């Protein structure tokens, strides 16, 4: 099954790589129109997933991620149109020049080829990833979670029908709809056809892909993000940054998970923070000095464990650690961080520069919320994932991250001397 799927995707990628921007945009426009026109059918299939989720007693938060409404579906169609408006990176000349030999050489952006994406309970990802891959001339094989099997199946049908209307191969976008996990393992070994694997989910999914894939894997998405409040920080402004970083949308990978506070201001600052967040239902996890201060401030607090310091909560839980100085803060981040997003709140330019230079992360912030680590916020237009690794792409992965490049060399029957 997957061998055939891989071959079809590879053949489709060959055709996609030759398309003009206008041809790709036309296909995306038809996809957006079909999402709107087929909304009743899509929502009916999504309702089946929701009913099964309730029968299986999935959490309210997970069911909410699964749910498609007329408004959300319209938002997905609008997102596809937004991708149309983005600049096409394929064919862009990165750099080049003429060598002493007279050979003209240019480095030109090209599609990667075939992308494999494994993700969990978010049907919107099906369209997000498909549209970004199509814009960059890549074919894609999608494998969503079993919780979205009905939604994904109908969404793929809509996309494939739209591709055929545009005169393009429908196998440019395919999905593994069988929930058998063995098929995931087979996809990870399909290196003859698939050029990159992008997992979108929790740490277990990323570890599975890293351990078993024979295809390059984009590692990321798991964010144990820290914010360090240094003693010179404007405390009132710092509280609003922390509020935003923790409570705006707790389930995201760029949410603050561990707050580091300098010892010299902890007794003054933490009670202010607790008071400000009192209506937000934040549960604190702390030890030693931080635990005592938070208890006295009347916070909902329990003792933090070593495992929790490495945990991406994805909720309104917040670890709080009191540290002696910036050196201790950076050391804590080195030990527990996931190289996603780290922030310092300070009035010292020297300490800010030290933090930037010494903290190893995809995004490092000075006096700002970690919530900005996002393709749209970074001006990339859209993202397929957030990478925390260092090879190929790092941070929010926009359209350019779905491309490679080739060296194009032109001569006048030029030979090497």
Curated annotation (Swiss-Prot):
Its EC number is 1.2.1.41. One of its GO terms (cellular component) is cytoplasm. GO terms for molecular function: glutamate-5-semialdehyde dehydrogenase activity; NADP binding. It is found in: Cytoplasm. Pfam families: Aldedh. GO terms for biological process: L-proline biosynthetic process. Keywords: Amino-acid biosynthesis, Cytoplasm, NADP, Oxidoreductase, Proline biosynthesis. Pathway: Amino-acid biosynthesis; L-proline biosynthesis; L-glutamate 5-semialdehyde from L-glutamate: step 2/2. It catalyses: L-glutamate 5-semialdehyde + phosphate + NADP(+) = L-glutamyl 5-phosphate + NADPH + H(+). Its main location: cytoplasm. It comes from the Bacteria. It is an enzyme of class 1 (oxidoreductase). PROSITE patterns: PROA (PS01223). Signal peptide: none annotated. Belongs to the gamma-glutamyl phosphate reductase family. PANTHER family: DELTA-1-PYRROLINE-5-CARBOXYLATE SYNTHASE (PTHR11063:SF8), GLUTAMATE SEMIALDEHYDE DEHYDROGENASE (PTHR11063). HAMAP family: ProA. Catalyzes the NADPH-dependent reduction of L-glutamate 5-phosphate into L-glutamate 5-semialdehyde and phosphate. The product spontaneously undergoes cyclization to form 1-pyrroline-5-carboxylate. This is Gamma-glutamyl phosphate reductase. It comes from Haemophilus influenzae (strain PittEE).
């Amino acid at each position: 099954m997957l061998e055939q799927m891989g071959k079809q995707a590879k053949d489709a990628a060959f055709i996609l790589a030759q398309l003009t921007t206008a041809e790709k945009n036309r296909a995306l426009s038809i996809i957006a129109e079909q999402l709107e026109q087929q909304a009743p059918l899509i929502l009916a299939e999504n309702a089946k997933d929701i009913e099964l989720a309730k029968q299986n007693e999935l959490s309210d938060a997970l069911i909410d991620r699964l749910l498609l409404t007329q408004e959300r579906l319209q938002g997905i169609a609008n997102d596809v149109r937004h991708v149309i408006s983005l600049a096409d990176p394929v064919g862009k000349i990165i750099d080049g020049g003429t060598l002493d030999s007279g050979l003209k050489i240019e480095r030109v952006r090209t599609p990667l080829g075939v992308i494999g994406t494994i993700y969990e309970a978010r049907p919107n990802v099906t369209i997000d990833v498909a549209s970004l891959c199509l814009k960059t001339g890549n074919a894609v094989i999608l494998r969503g979670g079993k919780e979205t099997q009905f939604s994904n199946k109908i969404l793929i049908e809509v996309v494939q029908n739209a591709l055929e209307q545009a005169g393009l191969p429908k196998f440019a976008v395919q999905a593994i709809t069988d929930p058998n996990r063995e098929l995931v393992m087979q996809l990870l070994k399909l290196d003859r056809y698939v050029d990159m694997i992008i997992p979108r989910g929790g740490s277990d999914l990323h570890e599975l892909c890293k351990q078993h894939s024979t295809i390059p894997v984009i590692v990321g998405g798991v964010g144990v993000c820290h914010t360090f409040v240094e003693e010179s920080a404007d405390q009132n402004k710092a509280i609003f940054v922390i509020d935003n970083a923790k409570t705006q949308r707790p389930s995201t990978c760029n949410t603050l998970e561990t707050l580091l506070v300098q010892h010299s201001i902890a007794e003054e600052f933490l009670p202010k923070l607790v008071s400000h967040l009192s209506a937000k239902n934040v549960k604190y996890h702390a030890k030693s000095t931080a635990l005592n201060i938070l208890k006295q401030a009347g916070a909902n607090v329990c003792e933090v464990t070593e495992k929790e310091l490495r945990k991406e909560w994805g909720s309104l839980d917040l670890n709080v650690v009191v540290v002696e100085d910036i050196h201790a803060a950076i050391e804590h981040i080195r030990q527990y961080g996931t190289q996603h997003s780290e922030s310092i709140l300070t009035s010292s330019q020297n300490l800010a520069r030290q933090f930037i230079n010494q903290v190893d992360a995809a995004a490092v912030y000075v006096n700002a919320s970690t919530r900005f680590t996002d393709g749209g916020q970074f001006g990339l237009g859209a993202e397929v994932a957030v990478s925390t690794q260092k090879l190929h792409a790092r941070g929010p992965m926009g359209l350019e991250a779905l491309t490679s490049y080739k060296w194009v060399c032109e001569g006048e029957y030029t030979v090497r001397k």
